[in-house]
Amino acid sequence: MLDCPRLALLCALPWLLRAAVPGHRAEPLKRSAELPRNPRDPARGADFDRVYSGVVSLSTENIYSFNHTSHPGQVTAVRVHVNSSSDNLDYPVLVVVRQQKQVLSWQVPLPFQGLYQRSYNYQEVSRTLCPSKATNETGPLEQLIFVDVASMAPHGAHYKLLVTKIKHFQLRTNVAFYFTASPSQPQYFLYKFPEDVDSVIIKVVSEKAYPCSVVSVQNIMCPVYDLDHDVEFNGVYQSMTKQAAITLQKDFPDEQFFVVFVIKPEDYACGGSFSIQENENQTWNLQRSKNLKVTIVPSVKGSVYVKSSLFSVFVFLSFYLGCLLVVFVHHMRFQRKPVDGSFGSGDGSGNMAVSHPITASTPEGSNYGAIDESSSSPGRQMSSSDGGQPCHSDTDSSVEESDFDTMPDIESDKNVIRTKMFLYLSDLSRKDRRIVSKKYKIYFWNIITIAVFYALPVMQLVITYQTVVNVTGNQDICYYNFLCAHPLGVLSAFNNILSNLGHVLLGFLFLLIVLRRDLLHRRALEAKDIFAMEYGIPKHFGLFYAMGIALMMEGVLSACYHVCPNYSNFQFDTSFMYMIAGLCMLKLYQTRHPDINASAYSAYASFAVVITLTVLGVVFGKNDVWFWIIFSAIHVLASLALSTQIYYMGRFKIDVSDTDLGIFRRAAMVFYTDCIQQCSRPLYMDRMVLLIVGNLVNWSFALFGLIYRPRDFASYMLGIFICNLLLYLAFYIIMKLRSSEKVLPLPVFCIVATAVVWAAALYFFFQNLSSWEGTPAESREKNRECVLLGFFDDHDIWHFLSATALFFSFLVLLTLDDDLDVVRRDQIPVF
């Protein structure tokens, strides 16, 4: 064991060796050791708000001491500014700030890493020191702050030092505060919740979009992460161009937090362009400063949540009351009518004079392929005069029965019946009612299966998204309207979810209405009611049930989408929008063509193809011309193929098994017969007009997409569906009026309500409060304040109105042909 003199000599050996180095001066270290004994030394008596200049090198280090006092109830902070004229990254000026509980250090020039290994170096750096809080128990808190300035430069590096006290460090409620920040001069401030405030919204505004910035909210802890590379390590944060907003609950320790503002060295995170850097070590000082305004305002109280929730429920429950009132009025009117003949006298007296049950005999001389009908039937008269066969006199005794083809399958051959010039509903409702009803029930059961398998993974995914947002604090994951996003529990925007309640409630109400009609129709069939069996549009409710389920699922999936709306889950609710539009078109077609509608399997397979194309369009449709060429070709060809099937009532077939060019001869013959030989007037004029207009609309969509290539491909595809649906509905109503059919008051009311509500809904839809097509910061530029009850924004109103408009649209389809319930099916034209 070493004795004491030898141990003391060994401990002093490093200092002796340092003193023996030629040219080395130990004076700064000596001054540091003598600071308490030399009152004239600047390391002891440094003052706030005074600029200190100096040179540091390998042999010189300067230490400044500042005395800072904190008083109870007052939170003050200190800010250190360091500037260096040197741009040598190999020998930067090193700054170390020592406080009572922490150490903060940085270098000047301060480097920032950008994309693709770009480097941005700043010669002027300002940092705010973590404040110390004095309590009433301890009284004023006095502490020393040491600022060490050093460098390893062999020839010295110049610097300037300024230490100031921040006068306005604590933000106040409803008071705007203006300041400036840059990448090397971040800012943060303190906010403490007032006693009567449970939640607040931090609103940050800037007049210019760039430079890109980040707003962060962090717990009161040191160090504060206020640089670009570490601001995402703690708290809640979001990128910003012109505005940002963060809603916070009163669940922070000591009910206070830091609001941190960081300017990014590059703008790519906010959608900006790259900066061209000529010199690898180029320094940046004032080029990326940004003026900001921050205002912290109280958010809505809990009573607003309750009031808004009750408002949403009662608004849509009023529809239930309205439907009950309509049912009661109809019931009372039905009870007042006499039993005998009452059904026809009130709603269809104009047709009852000639309407009677279909007989089993066929009038002599009826046209080839005609249905069984009485001599007074307009359908028979039109078929006999325009059917294309020569007209024979019914009284011509020279006509032998053997002159006619009496094959028994003539009256059931689809190729004969569906190619007649004038078709009536009885021609296309010849199949067994039970079989057809089961066929349409498949739509209902299939959509339930699709909904379950579709919704469960969606719910799991959005819950994962919300969990990631809550755990990481990264609010750039979801594209909310942050100026009107009211959290509840783990949900960040409860108001966007609540506003979808209307789809579910109105969808369920529509199912109840359809169920009532279905039960009444079944009772009529069980009672052998002649009007239920042979009059009016055949009642098949499978598609209506499917539409009701689709409306409910639209609400569920829209709510799931709004849990965390972003680029990855937009198709959650748009998928059922496509299905709703498609089901409505199928229902319109099925009304007058009950026997030849598409099967549920092919219909849902078509929807799957549409959704697949939509996803591909969102991924590839922004810049790839080849996708638009392929999609436009598919769109045009699909329109032509569907038009052909509709024009020929599904009876157009080409024998592809003929290998000696028979397919082309068949196509040429059809073209010659229907387009050239009869060019003066198509065989089916009404259908031809509809299909020409429909093809022009679809070709216009295809041409528009090919030329302009819209970025929002999902909305573009939805526009195609909606325009086709509106076109078909308008054609249906026009043809109905042209056929001298009536539109009862209830469907007239539904049509008017549908038009008015859809117009209002589309106004709010196009407000564009956010958009996942750009960056999160660009999306926040479109954010706006709440407009209804201080709780709902424009998009929430779109949810309310669109649910109502869809409900009325469904009622239009359900009630439009109620006037035909007293008209024989062989008198109802097909169009």
UniProtKB/Swiss-Prot annotation:
GO BP field: RNA transport
Upper classification of the organism: Eukaryota, Metazoa, Chordata, Craniata, Vertebrata
Signal sequence segment: 1-19
Database matches in InterPro entries: SID1_TM_fam
Pfam family, one: SID-1_RNA_chan
Amino acid composition bias (Low complexity), ranges on this chain: 374-385
Entry keyword set: Glycoprotein, Membrane, RNA-binding, Signal, Transmembrane, Transmembrane helix
Subcellular location: Membrane
Membrane topology, as annotated: Multi-pass membrane protein
Side Cytoplasmic, residues: 330-441, 515-540, 590-599, 647-687, 736-745, 817-831
Keyword rRNA processing: no
TM helices/strands, residue ranges: 309-329, 442-462, 494-514, 541-561, 572-589, 600-620, 626-646, 688-708, 715-735, 746-766, 796-816
Entry keyword annotation includes Glycoprotein: yes
A single Gene Ontology CC term: plasma membrane
Function in brief: In vitro binds long double-stranded RNA (dsRNA) (500 and 700 base pairs), but not dsRNA shorter than 300 bp. Not involved in RNA autophagy, a process in which RNA is directly imported into lysosomes in an ATP-dependent manner, and degraded.
Glycosylated position list: 67, 83, 136, 281, 470, 566, 768
Compositionally biased residues, Acidic residues: 397-408
Disordered, as annotated region: 354-408
Protein's UniProt name: SID1 transmembrane family member 1
Entry GO MF terms: cholesterol binding; double-stranded RNA binding; RNA transmembrane transporter activity
